[in-house]
């Protein structure tokens, strides 16, 4: 194979490797964004009203926001 053919194949290989590397970076950024969204949603679910906090404080528990509305519990998950 001529020197020019080897150079062309090398160039194609480098282009392919660079494109593959960029795809991996985009995938990693997408995964990182998805994790950040999950964290924000988790914190939003913990938003509770002062009334709930006062009611649970009497029972020495924390006010947790669930699908069915606020409730008192020793630990909040989610």
Curated annotation (Swiss-Prot):
Signal peptide limits: 1-19
On whether Iron is a keyword of this UniProt record, the answer is no
Q: Which is one Pfam family of this protein?
A: Conotoxin
* Organism encoding this protein: Conus caracteristicus
Q: What is known of its domains?
A: The presence of a 'disulfide through disulfide knot' structurally defines this protein as a knottin. The cysteine framework is VI/VII (C-C-CC-C-C).
* Family, similarity comment: Belongs to the conotoxin O3 superfamily.
Give the record's GO CC terms.
extracellular region
| Subcellular location(s) of the protein | Secreted
Q: In which tissues is it expressed?
A: Expressed by the venom duct.
Record-listed Phenylalanine amide modification sites? 77
Keywords tagged on the record: Amidation, Cleavage on pair of basic residues, Disulfide bond, Knottin, Neurotoxin, Secreted, Signal, Toxin
Q: Which residues form the propeptide?
A: 20-44
A GO molecular function held by the record? ion channel inhibitor activity
Protein's name according to its UniProt entry:
Conotoxin CaFr179
Presence of the UniProt keyword Secreted in the record = yes
Report disulfide bridges, numbered on this chain: 52-64, 56-72, 63-76
Question: This protein's superkingdom?
Answer: Eukaryota
């Amino acid at each position: 194979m001529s020197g020019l053919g080897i150079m062309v194949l090398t160039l194609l290989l480098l282009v392919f490797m660079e494109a593959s590397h960029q795809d991996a970076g985009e995938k990693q950024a997408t995964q990182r964004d998805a994790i950040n969204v999950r964290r924000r949603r988790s914190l939003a679910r913990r938003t509770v009203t002062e009334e709930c906090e006062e009611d649970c404080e009497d029972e020495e528990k924390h006010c947790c926001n669930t699908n069915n509305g606020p409730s008192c519990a020793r630990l909040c998950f989610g």
